[in-house]
């Protein structure tokens, strides 16, 4: 509606919930890095920080797909129909990979991780998409009931 503010109550609640989900999955990645990084030469805190950084970056890239619509778009053509969003995701992923896998590591103070830990990063970031899409499905269902 014309007179409705940009930041409505529902919109702010959605932002808060989505931010909390991303934060929770980032903390899970950090604590996983602390646990598995204890035996690594780089040290547990550095491994945990690297995992949190990578998870947060990848989560924000993936969150662009979540932000396309108020209704769930997971497993629909609509999810990938914006070529500029797809391109920006790929560029962002390439930049993150350059930070994690190439000689840019010292600049960002990140360390080499095991393949399993990279899998945890991807898993935690992907879980954000799934969890937020489920919440959007629930919210859409509840709106229809009203």
List the predicted regions and their residue ranges.
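C-terminal transmembrane helices and immediately adjacent loops/tails
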Residues: 1-146
